Amino acid sequence: MSGQQGMGDGFLTTTLDAITNWGRANSIWPMPMGLSCCAIEMMAMAGPRYDIARFGAEVFRFSPRQSDLMIVAGTVTYKMATVVKKIWDQMPEPKWCIAMGACSSSGGMFRSYPVVQGIDQFLPVDVYVPGCPPRPDAVIHAVMEIQEKIKRQKDSFQDSFLAEDDAPQVRQPESPKEKEKLTVSE
């Protein structure tokens, strides 16, 4: 864990952010959006030969409310893009996205009017995995890149509870008459 400092026998100090990021990075819950042939390679990644369980991402969640990583695998049409975006919006923060394969990254070989030429037109993509279809070890490498990105996050855990948008707003009176109205209580 980054940010750790030893303090002698049996003591270890760290920050709350470092321990939170360590937990998030080692317990990723992916949600597969298998739309094409890349989904077959994604299923192979979860099998015993590649063993994605080593990286804490063995449990695929098919509910967006229980996942924090969306793996979009395959061709996305404009009609399907609205569905993918709605599912993305249902995922809790923090969340990450992997564009798996040439079709989800850039439209692939389907350069026609109904196909979205890259899901980065409507989703923030964290890692692109090249290939048609990409091998399972390439997807595992992408999961490892997501883990490193999570570990490097700098946003403060405490600041998320004290965001300026949530702070109580105090309005100051503008005129003496308005000040009287605010001080009189009946």
Swiss-Prot record:
Cofactor-binding details, from the entry: Binds 1 [4Fe-4S] cluster.
Protein name: NADH-quinone oxidoreductase subunit B 1
Homology family: Belongs to the complex I 20 kDa subunit family.
Record localization: Cell inner membrane
Stated role: NDH-1 shuttles electrons from NADH, via FMN and iron-sulfur (Fe-S) centers, to quinones in the respiratory chain. The immediate electron acceptor for the enzyme in this species is believed to be a menaquinone. Couples the redox reaction to proton translocation (for every two electrons transferred, four hydrogen ions are translocated across the cytoplasmic membrane), and thus conserves the redox energy in a proton gradient.
Protein residues bound to [4Fe-4S] cluster: C37, C38, C103, C132
Basic and acidic residues composition-biased segments: 174-186
The enzyme's E.C. designation: 7.1.1.-
Catalytic activity: a quinone + NADH + 5 H(+)(in) = a quinol + NAD(+) + 4 H(+)(out)
